[in-house]
Amino acid sequence: MKSLVIVFVVLLGVAMISANEEELLAILQDQRNDARGGCMNRYKSNICGTLVTPMNCIAPRTRMGKFARKFCQFMCGIC
Protein backbone atom coordinates (compact mmCIF):
# COMPACT_ATOMS: atom_id res chain seq x y z
CA MET A 1 0.00 0.00 0.00
CA LYS A 2 2.83 2.41 0.86
CA SER A 3 4.57 1.72 -2.43
CA LEU A 4 1.34 2.39 -4.32
CA VAL A 5 1.03 5.79 -2.63
CA ILE A 6 4.65 6.59 -3.47
CA VAL A 7 4.06 5.67 -7.12
CA PHE A 8 1.01 7.95 -7.29
CA VAL A 9 2.93 10.85 -5.72
CA VAL A 10 5.78 10.42 -8.21
CA LEU A 11 3.36 10.23 -11.14
CA LEU A 12 1.58 13.34 -9.93
CA GLY A 13 4.91 15.19 -9.73
CA VAL A 14 5.85 14.12 -13.25
CA ALA A 15 2.45 15.20 -14.55
CA MET A 16 2.80 18.62 -12.92
CA ILE A 17 6.22 19.16 -14.47
CA SER A 18 5.02 18.01 -17.89
CA ALA A 19 1.96 20.27 -17.73
CA ASN A 20 4.13 23.39 -17.35
CA GLU A 21 6.54 22.54 -20.16
CA GLU A 22 5.73 25.63 -22.23
CA GLU A 23 6.19 27.88 -19.21
CA LEU A 24 9.51 26.25 -18.33
CA LEU A 25 10.72 26.63 -21.91
CA ALA A 26 9.78 30.32 -21.87
CA ILE A 27 11.75 30.85 -18.65
CA LEU A 28 14.74 29.01 -20.09
CA GLN A 29 14.62 31.10 -23.26
CA ASP A 30 14.56 34.32 -21.21
CA GLN A 31 17.59 33.18 -19.22
CA ARG A 32 19.49 32.33 -22.39
CA ASN A 33 18.72 35.72 -23.91
CA ASP A 34 19.86 37.52 -20.76
CA ALA A 35 22.76 35.23 -19.82
CA ARG A 36 25.38 38.00 -19.73
CA GLY A 37 23.29 40.20 -17.43
CA GLY A 38 24.21 38.23 -14.32
CA CYS A 39 27.83 37.76 -15.30
CA MET A 40 29.67 40.99 -14.66
CA ASN A 41 33.43 41.29 -14.84
CA ARG A 42 34.07 43.59 -11.89
CA TYR A 43 37.78 42.81 -11.68
CA LYS A 44 38.64 42.83 -15.39
CA SER A 45 41.86 44.80 -15.41
CA ASN A 46 43.53 43.93 -12.14
CA ILE A 47 42.60 40.47 -10.84
CA CYS A 48 40.70 38.19 -13.23
CA GLY A 49 43.12 36.96 -15.85
CA THR A 50 46.30 38.22 -14.21
CA LEU A 51 46.32 37.15 -10.57
CA VAL A 52 43.45 34.67 -10.84
CA THR A 53 43.87 32.18 -13.68
CA PRO A 54 41.49 29.59 -15.16
CA MET A 55 43.38 26.93 -13.22
CA ASN A 56 42.05 28.50 -10.01
CA CYS A 57 38.50 27.72 -11.14
CA ILE A 58 39.03 24.00 -10.67
CA ALA A 59 40.59 24.23 -7.21
CA PRO A 60 37.61 23.37 -4.99
CA ARG A 61 38.98 24.12 -1.53
CA THR A 62 41.17 27.16 -2.01
CA ARG A 63 40.34 30.80 -1.41
CA MET A 64 41.47 31.68 -4.94
CA GLY A 65 39.17 29.01 -6.34
CA LYS A 66 36.17 30.34 -4.42
CA PHE A 67 36.99 33.88 -5.52
CA ALA A 68 37.37 32.81 -9.15
CA ARG A 69 34.05 30.98 -9.20
CA LYS A 70 32.28 33.91 -7.56
CA PHE A 71 33.75 36.96 -9.32
CA CYS A 72 35.49 35.64 -12.46
CA GLN A 73 32.61 33.53 -13.76
CA PHE A 74 33.25 34.49 -17.39
CA MET A 75 36.75 33.08 -17.11
CA CYS A 76 35.61 29.84 -15.45
CA GLY A 77 32.99 29.15 -18.11
CA ILE A 78 30.09 29.51 -15.67
CA CYS A 79 28.31 32.14 -17.75
Curated annotation (Swiss-Prot):
Residues 1-19 form the signal peptide. The keyword Secreted applies. It comes from the Eukaryota. Keywords: Nematocyst, Secreted, Signal, Toxin. It is found in: Secreted; Nematocyst. GO terms for cellular component: extracellular region; nematocyst. GO terms for molecular function: toxin activity. Residues 20-36 form a propeptide. Belongs to the sea anemone 8 toxin family. This is U-actitoxin-Avd8a. It comes from Anemonia viridis (Snakelocks anemone).
